[in-house]
Amino acid sequence: MTARRPTRFAKGELNVYRAPRDVTDVTRALRSTGRRVVLVPTMGALHEGHLTLIRAAKRVQGAVVVVSIFVNPLQFGAGEDLDAYPRTLDDDLAALRAEGVEIAFTPTVGDMYPDGTRTSVHPGPLGDDLEGASRPGHFAGVLTVVCKLLHIVRPDRAFFGEKDYQQLVLIRQMVTDLNIDTKIVGVPTVREADGLALSSRNRYLDEVEREQAGALSAALLAGMYAASNGAAATLDAARAVLDEVPAIEVDYLQVRDPMLGPVPHEGAARLLVAARLGQTRLLDNIAVDIGASDGIDGHPRVGSPDHQLPWRN
């Protein structure tokens, strides 16, 4: 039997691999030389938010950055048009070259699921809450593909944006519960000048909808400033802003603790919103300090002169 030839890797260049086995072989070899492998999973259609994740990953000393580009069919449900999801591979690879990324993993559905989806990761009760209530099976699909990516790449760290906050919490839960030896790093949401969270889906908004979409981040900001008066005041302030834009159909607006459990009486929490504008579903969230008049852990209270708004870059 002929021995398999080593997979080629050119240091300092963008190496594009489709086969999971090739990525596994290359990252194993790189680790043996002392390189730290870090992963940025994406579904392509890269924008500044993705590039921010990549830049955060590149700051890891000695890191070789792996960016996966895979539109995962398992996380699309009924009524969600998988075929319409933007696919811009050539542009994405050009962006990765410009950022100095060394590995792009671009598998097909057949590469990732050669025998179909016989095995999947169940997210537990949180997977049926918030986003999961509107998108049954979504998080099982997300966790399954992330679990596979972590086993294929075996990264020291993997980087995810805080915009998809429930996803971030569930991935951290999975890594802990399944003893996966990867540190999950959350990166703050990247925003447009008016506060709108960057998303590949923003391209579906028309000009009027794009202007209206700024109400989501404005609502979160209003809630953040009201948080010192409690969770109910937080929700009331955010809801008042959203109510001013009738075109926004709110799916949920909730305050939870940082792990998305019940809202705390006082302390660190998360304000989350999901809404539909036209045919586009938008998500956003922000950290809030419930009932905190003097800040938490030495951080200034939101609204104080020393507090920096999250999108004042």
UniProtKB/Swiss-Prot annotation:
Beta-alanine binds at Q75. The keyword ATP-binding applies. GO terms for molecular function: ATP binding; pantoate-beta-alanine ligase activity. The keyword Repressor does not apply. Keywords: ATP-binding, Cytoplasm, Ligase, Nucleotide-binding, Pantothenate biosynthesis. It is found in: Cytoplasm. Its main location: cytoplasm. HAMAP family: PanC. Homodimer. Catalyzes the condensation of pantoate with beta-alanine in an ATP-dependent reaction via a pantoyl-adenylate intermediate. This is Pantothenate synthetase. It comes from Mycobacterium sp. (strain KMS).
